[in-house]
Amino acid sequence: MKINVNSVKFKVDSKLESLIKEKIEKLSVLYDSILSSDVILKLDNTSTIDNKVVEVRLAIKGNDLFSKKQSKTFDEALDNATDALKKQLTKHKGKVKKI
């Protein structure tokens, strides 16, 4: 699976990038038909504490799954986004098995 990591207006350090890849690769254990993923990191509205935004798009057969979460840290936002995607993947996997 190909994992693309992009950031808006800042550079991602290697520690955060490796954490992102690790979390996304764990999703492929749950559902093996993930073709690729795009992760976008943003700093949104710098006047608030919860200004770190993580958007994750998983390309799978049929539809794409998407999650966007905002938090105090990128790590926390990434955790929330991957948790949401786990739920979406489980739901999608159930639909595929019914067909």
How would you label these PLM feature ranges?
Residues 1-99:
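N-terminal, polar/charged subdomain of small-to-medium soluble alpha/beta proteins
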